[in-house]
C-alpha cells in the first residue's frame, strides 16, 4: 500500500447497506487515493467484510465486540478513540477524519477537508473541520467560516490536536459512562479553539432509527433544510473554497462566529459548565 499521510475512518454498527453506499460515494471523491481508509465494525459479519473488500481491497478493517456491561455511549466512544489512535499512532497520519456509517459524503468531501487542512494546519487556534450544515444559497457552494462550536457528523483534526483530544477522550472510555464524545469535548474545544464549517453541507445523515435521527425525522423542517444544503450533485465543478468572516450559520443558536466578542462570552460561560 502506498504511503499516505492522511486517513479517514468510519465507525459502523448494524447499518450495512448504508455503510456500503457511503464507501462507494467516498471512492468517487477526487482525493480518495491520498487517504488511508479504515472501517471499525462493531459486531460485524464475514459477509460484510467481503463486501467492503470488494469495493476497495485496501480498506483496513478492525472488528470490535463489547460485553453487556458497556453502555451504548461507551461503545461509541471506544470505537471513536480506537479509530483516531490507530490512524495517528500506527499509520502516522498528519490529519484524520471520522465519519459515522449513516453519513453519506458529498462528491468533494475529501477535497474540502484536504484543502482547508492545508490552509489552516499551522494555526494553533484551529481545532477541527466539520462537514455539516443546513444553509442554502446557490452562490455559496464553496464558502466556509470559523466558529466557536464543537464537532460531529463528519469531522477531522490535525495531529497536533490529537494529544489534547486523546487526553479528553480517555475520561469517557469507562464501561458505565453515559455521555457521547462530541458533547464531552464541546466546551473543552470552545474555550480554546475554533472549528471550520462549510456553508453547504458536505454530509447528509440517513435517518435509521439510530442514536440521533429517526426515520420519522426526515419529514421535519430541520432535516429538509439539511438535505437541501447537501452538495450532492457531481455536475458542479470544484471551485476554490472561499473564507467568509461574516457568514451566517444557524445549525444551532450556540454556534457562534469566531471573533473577540464571542470569545469573551464563551470564556465567562465556561465557568458554569
What are these regions (language model features)?
Residues 2-99, 103-273:
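Peripheral/terminal regions associated with large enzymatic or DNA-binding modules
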Amino acid at each position: 500500500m502506498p504511503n499516505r499521510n492522511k486517513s479517514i475512518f468510519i465507525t459502523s454498527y448494524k447499518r450495512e447497506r448504508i455503510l456500503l453506499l457511503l464507501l462507494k460515494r467516498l471512492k468517487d471523491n477526487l482525493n480518495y487515493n491520498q487517504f488511508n481508509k479504515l472501517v471499525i465494525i462493531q459486531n460485524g459479519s464475514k459477509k460484510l467484510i467481503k463486501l467492503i473488500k470488494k469495493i476497495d481491497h485496501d480498506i483496513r478493517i478492525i472488528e470490535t465486540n463489547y460485553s453487556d456491561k458497556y453502555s451504548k455511549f461507551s461503545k461509541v466512544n471506544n470505537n471513536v478513540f480506537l479509530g483516531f489512535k490507530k490512524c495517528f499512532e500506527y499509520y502516522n497520519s498528519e490529519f484524520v477524519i471520522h465519519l459515522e456509517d449513516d453519513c453519506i459524503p458529498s462528491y468533494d468531501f475529501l477535497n474540502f477537508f484536504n484543502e482547508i487542512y492545508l490552509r489552516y494546519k499551522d494555526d494553533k487556534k484551529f481545532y477541527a473541520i466539520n462537514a455539516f450544515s443546513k444553509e442554502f444559497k446557490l452562490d455559496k457552494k464553496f464558502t466556509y467560516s470559523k466558529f466557536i462550536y464543537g464537532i460531529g457528523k463528519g469531522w477531522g483534526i490535525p495531529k497536533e490536536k490529537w494529544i489534547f483530544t486523546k487526553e479528553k477522550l480517555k475520561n469517557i472510555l469507562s464501561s458505565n459512562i453515559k455521555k457521547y464524545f462530541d458533547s464531552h469535548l464541546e466546551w473543552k474545544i470552545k474555550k480554546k479553539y475554533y472549528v471550520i464549517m462549510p456553508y453547504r453541507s458536505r454530509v447528509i445523515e440517513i435517518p435509521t432509527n439510530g442514536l440521533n435521527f429517526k426515520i420519522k425525522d426526515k419529514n421535519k423542517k430541520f432535516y429538509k433544510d439539511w438535505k437541501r444544503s447537501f452538495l450532492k450533485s457531481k455536475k458542479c465543478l470544484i471551485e476554490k473554497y472561499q473564507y467568509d468572516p461574516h457568514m451566517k450559520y444557524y445549525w444551532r443558536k450556540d454556534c457562534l462566529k469566531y471573533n473577540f466578542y464571542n470569545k469573551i462570552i464563551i470564556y465567562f460561560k465556561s465557568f458554569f459548565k
